[in-house]
Amino acid sequence: MTKREIEITTEDGVANAGLFGQAGGAGVILYMDAFGARAALDCMAERLAGQGYVVLVPDLFYRHAPYGPFDARTAFSAPATAMKIRGLLTATTQAMTMADSGAFLDALEREGVKGPVGTVGYCMGGARALNAAAAFPDRIRAAASFHGGNLASDAADSPYNNATRIKARVYVGSAGVDKSFPPEQSGRLAQALRAAEVDHIIENYAGMAHGWCVPDHGVYDEAGAERHWKRLTGFFAETLT
């Protein structure tokens, strides 16, 4: 499937994004992980677009471009590279991404997406996918996170704090061992979503490590990734049609 490069004007500049799929389908915003927009995420977007969706993969680090490229298998084992990535994460706040998300939604509309929109995020993108649903409750119908970190941390911008604003259905796939989303956060998120009457599922992928879904990651697990695809495509089929 052909990738089309587009530019999206935001409050802070211009974000590059990849667009996949044909006009007429429901829209999906894929929020990247900490290693940035790259071929591995393009492959994932292509697979999702093959289900009939129009998939947008924006570069969330556009304010600091050019950067990288980063090798997801080794980036955090090299101190200098790890420092660069952490700097990008710190400098790209949830509030920035939420402001950008309005522009991302508008871009999908310009590309012919008139119906419901879903979000899915990996790693740092998981929290952003859920927070986008809170920021745009009347535009986002489904939000999914896989190995998303800090979904119910003590940070003010942690998604569980925004549960009462979410109207979308929510799916969270957590890695079995993940310091960024330990069991106590899972319980806190579940409590917040249930109290807010959010239709949700939180599923633990036992034996999987943070990053298992993304094919260029060092902990990629094919069986676990295929299970993630089954859940994600089923979730969107139920919510975006």
Which residue ranges define each predicted feature?
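N-terminal cap/leader regions of alpha/beta-hydrolase-fold enzymes
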Residues: 1-241
